[in-house]
Design a protein with these regions (language model features):
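Hydrophobic alpha-helical transmembrane segments
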Residues: 15-19, 55, 59, 75-76, ...
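Hydrophobic alpha-helical transmembrane segments in multi-pass integral membrane proteins
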Residues: 136-146
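Hydrophobic transmembrane alpha-helices
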Residues: 2-64
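Internal alpha-helical transmembrane segments of multi-pass membrane proteins
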Residues: 92-97, 112-133
Length: 194
């Protein structure tokens, strides 16, 4: 009889990697938030358009999950990135922390489904799309209660597409590039990203 029990051993690098991703993206988010604010006059014409810009905020969880592939890595990275952004004066304050949790859980769930083993492009695209869906629910309730049904559908579609493309596809491209350059300390190996 085989033991299929998931055994997890954390090394220092398994914690340092999500933290480094988080700090980098916390700073990036501050800059991206400024760009997002500059685009506000254009997106205010039809608010659901803002959803198409959201996938970038999902990157810490997707990257940490792909690189470390251990329970909690995506959550640690996304929540810490949100904390850094909020601490540096991000415009959304404490709501950023709630978003951090909401944005990390779909990646954690997707990795759990594959027992934290091989995480390929399909997994990260699905995780990105699910993250977009989850974040759309949170933002619809918290920030956009005025949306009519049609606006809500458009917003959800934009969030899901953005999560899959700006989140999932970009994360996959970054990890693939890092693996090809042999800059990752562990999984995925270059053969995992072909």
């Amino acid at each position: 009889m085989t033991n299929d029990k998931l055994t997890v051993r954390y090394r220092t690098i398994d914690i340092v990697t999500p933290v480094m991703i988080a700090v980098a993206f916390g700073v990036i988010f501050l800059g991206y938030g400024a760009v997002y604010s500059l685009l506000k006059p254009a997106t205010s014409v039809y608010l659901p358009i803002e959803g198409i810009l959201s996938g970038i905020w999902f990157l810490p969880a997707l990257l940490a999950g792909l690189i470390v592939r251990k329970p909690g890595a995506a959550l640690l990275s996304e929540v810490l990135a949100a904390t850094v952004e909020a601490a540096l004066g991000g415009p959304w304050g404490a709501g950023t922390l709630i978003s951090g949790v909401v944005q990390a859980l779909p990646m954690e769930l997707c990795l759990l489904v594959v027992a934290y083993r091989k995480a390929g492009p399909k997994l990260v695209l699905v995780a990105g799309a699910l993250t977009g869906f989850a974040e759309a629910i949170y933002e619809r309730i918290s920030y956009y209660p005025m949306f009519r049904f049609g606006d809500t559908i458009v917003y959800f579609v934009f969030m899901i597409v953005s999560g899959a493309l700006l989140g999932g596809l970009v994360a996959w491209g970054i990890v693939r590039g890092l693996a090809a350059a042999c800059l990752l300390y562990t999984s995925p190996s270059p053969r995992d990203v072909e």
